[in-house]
Amino acid sequence: SLFELGKMILQETGKNPAKSYGAYGCNCGVLGRGKPKDATDRCCYVHKCCYKKLTGCNPKKDRYSYSWKDKTIVCGENNPCLKELCECDKAVAICLRENLGTYNKKYRYHLKPFCKKADDC
């Protein structure tokens, strides 16, 4: 769910997920999809593509369990869809951390109508 995703992003990046990524670029946040503006936005684009591959669960609502061991996210689910959902969220949180160096505040509240159409996943 959005709750676990937000928690993972906070743990990996140290940033407030809603404030820092809720409307970042063309792909971060609930709305929008478009050609990524930078590496951070690309993380969100790949994350949305990951969600598209899921079948049998709702990425925004379904809860899953994970643990934080030695600063590492460990997904712990028996349900295959919830396990994949957790892995999608883990991947974006790590990607956002790996691209903190190029995070650009000018894209924090980017207007989605200015986004160009993205390639298909």
Swiss-Prot record:
Keyword annotations from UniProtKB, A to Z: Disulfide bond, Myotoxin, Secreted, Toxin
CDD domains in the cross-refs: PLA2c (cd00125)
Cell compartments where the protein resides: Secreted
One of the GO biological process terms: phospholipid metabolic process
An annotated GO cellular component: extracellular region
InterPro entries recorded: PLipase_A2, PLipase_A2_Asp_AS, PLipase_A2_dom, PLipase_A2_dom_sf, PLipase_A2_His_AS
Family stated for the protein in its record: Belongs to the phospholipase A2 family. Group II subfamily. K49 sub-subfamily.
Protein name: Basic phospholipase A2 homolog piratoxin-2
